[in-house]
Amino acid sequence: MALDASALMAPVERDVRLFEELERLLGEVDLLVPAAVRAELDRLAAGASAEAAAARVGSDLTERGRTVTTSERNGDDALVALATAGEAEYVVTADRPLRDRLLDAGVPVVETRGRTRLEITEP
């Protein structure tokens, strides 16, 4: 399962208990974080805004997964590449355009439903 920056920021921005919800849905899973997503979080973490604070938490949460390097420099592109190559069965995101790209590519998406719950959307 691969994690997007928006998913890693959700515990702060949406009060989602990310890892508890993932375990509820799918049990224990191997979590992947593309290096490009980690770099995106590091860029967003600069400053004193609420988004920066959420990105700092998200960056810390990447430690719970395995960082993987891809040839893609953009986080969304890296997630699509991992999933379509079969390296990630699901992608967790709150990003609507990424969600649509993944579903169009036949990849199941774990996304927020309501304020604090995650659900699986199948293609």
Language model segments and positions:
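Acidic, PIN/NYN-like endoribonuclease modules and their adjacent C-terminal/linker elements
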Residues: R99-P123
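Residue-level detector of structured alpha->beta connecting loops
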Residues: G27-D30, E87, G106
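Short, surface-exposed amphipathic charged segments that create phosphate/polyanion-binding patches used
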Residues: A46-G47, A83, E122-P123
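Residues at the C-termini of beta-strands that transition into short coil/loop
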Residues: A35, S71, R113
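Acidic, metal-associated active-site segment
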Residues: R73-Y90, R96-D104
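Domain-level signal for Mg2+-assisted phosphodiester chemistry and nucleotide/NA-binding surfaces
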Residues: M1-R64
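Short, hydrophobic beta-strand segments that form beta-sheet elements in well-ordered domains
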Residues: L31-V33, Y90-T93
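Short acidic-hydrophobic, aromatic-tinged amphipathic segments that line or gate anion-handling sites
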Residues: R66-R73
